[in-house]
Curated annotation (Swiss-Prot):
Species this protein is from: Homo sapiens
Active-site residues per Swiss-Prot or TrEMBL entry: S189, D341, H371
Protein name, entry field: Arylacetamide deacetylase-like 2
SUPFAM superfamilies: alpha/beta-Hydrolases (SSF53474)
Keyword annotations from UniProtKB, A to Z: Disulfide bond, Hydrolase, Secreted, Signal
InterPro entries linked to this entry: AB_hydrolase_3, AB_hydrolase_fold, Arylacetamide_deacetylase, GDXG_lipolytic_enzyme, Lipase_GDXG_put_SER_AS
Family: Belongs to the 'GDXG' lipolytic enzyme family.
Endpoints of the signal sequence: 1-18
EC number per UniProt: 3.1.1.-
Length: 401
């Protein structure tokens, strides 16, 4: 009995020492976030162990967990929910039931998940999109783009763009009773990346008749050109999303070759001919001073890979690499960033770049925010932070869309 208790105690100590992350002082519900973070890190650790033992790949294990949270398209007395396709792209569609004398607003939402995981069918995203449709009396479309590593870039971008272009067709807008002047593209995390890239493409394509009124980017990931930003250093072992996990997922977006994450961890992954792009992600210029702190800027090292991946220099994959002329036509933009988030500086730099070219930007920064908070809005993983961000997002849409 004593030996069993000792072994159990040692296992508990090992678990705590390996998965414990100190919580910042200003974090609300810190004990709950600590538990969620430990669960996330345990899943990541287990997935990596399984991959190393050749039981299953990392992304297969995590995807299996994500799928446990998928929901059916359940309609209610206010909203009709259906799973359908837009030009072969799976979408979940939310249509208000109450009669409207005028055409409705619409939101096209891209879910997060590091390009590798997730779905609009996830409980949290279904809840968010249903809430948005009901609160705004709006048509909402959740896009289920193809996932890596089964499908590498540009599959995700192409799916997102195809779904949006289909929705913007006059006959489709008429079918769903949507006002073509009141359409928003939104997304969180990697979904924020896709929302950004698709909006850039739509607004700069002269052949697309109807344009987007606004875009909403919630803690978006917009670049990996520089993998050693101040927010990367501060949140290297961060809450929910660590630097190693972020690099793992972004690498799988482009390739299965292990040379890429190895180079990314050392900030040596950009091809030799890409130095001209560094000005678009130079945090020593683009970040507000309070976030630069005493960090010293050094350029990424060129040529660490023995081959070049075109996606690493493509603004469709990394929207912060878009030049100023591509940004000038963008619509009203709402960007939300979180202090305790590895991706914080991506959003902050995009705010600066958009404002520099005259785009109207509303920026809200959550001082006690963490990455992925919108994933924690439903039982049993309920956080007040997630509901707060939901309410900020929907309230802003209601006033501006």
């Amino acid at each position: 009995m004593g030996l069993k208790a000792l072994c159990l105690g040692l296992l508990c100590v090992l678990f705590v020492s390996h998965f414990y992350t100190p919580m910042p002082d200003n974090i609300e519900e810190s004990w709950k976030i600590m538990a969620l973070d430990a669960i996330a890190k345990t899943c990541t650790f287990t997935a990596m162990c399984f991959e190393n033992m050749r039981i299953m790949r990392y992304e297969e294990f995590i995807s299996m967990i994500f799928r446990l949270d998928y929901t059916q398209p359940l309609s209610d007395e206010y909203i009709t929910v259906t799973d359908t396709t837009f030009v072969d792209i799976p979408v979940r569609l939310y249509l208000p039931k109450r009669k409207s004398e005028t055409r409705r607003r619409a939101v096209i939402y891209f879910h997060g998940g590091g390009f590798c995981f997730g779905s609009s069918k996830q409980r949290a995203f279904d809840f968010l999109n249903r809430w948005t449709a009901n609160t705004l009396d709006a048509v909402v479309v959740g896009v289920d783009y193809r996932l890596a590593p089964q499908h590498h870039f540009p599959a995700q971008f192409e799916d997102g763009l195809a779904a949006v272009k289909f929705f913007l067709l006059e006959k489709i807008l008429t079918k769903y009773g949507v006002d073509p002047t009141r359409i928003c593209i939104a997304g969180d995390s990697s979904g924020g990346n896709l929302a950004t890239a698709v909006t850039q493409q739509v607004q700069n394509d002269a052949e697309i008749k109807h344009k987007i009124k606004m875009q909403v980017l919630l803690y978006p990931g917009l670049q990996i050109t520089d993998s050693y930003l101040p927010s990367h250093r501060e949140n290297e072992h961060g809450i929910v999303l660590t630097r190693d996990v972020a690099i793992k997922l972004v690498s799988l977006y482009f390739t299965k070759d292990e040379a890429l994450p190895w180079a990314m961890r050392r900030n040596q992954h950009m091809p030799l001919e890409s130095r001209h792009l560094f000005k678009f992600v130079n945090w020593s210029i683009l970040l507000p001073e309070k976030y630069r702190k005493d960090y010293v800027y050094t350029e990424p090292i060129l040529g660490g890979l023995s081959y070049s991946l075109p996606g690493l220099t493509d603004s469709r994959a990394l929207p912060l690499l878009a030049n100023d002329s591509q940004l000038q036509n963008l619509p009203l933009t709402y960007i939300l960033t979180c202090q305790h988030d590895l991706l914080r500086d991506d959003g902050l730099m995009y705010v600066t770049r958009l404002r520099n070219v005259g785009v109207q930007v509303v920026h809200e920064h959550i001082e006690d925010g963490i990455h992925g908070a919108l994933s924690f809005m439903t039982s049993p993983f309920y956080l007040r932070l997630g509901l707060r961000i939901r309410d900020m997002y929907v309230s802003w849409l209601d006033k501006n869309l």
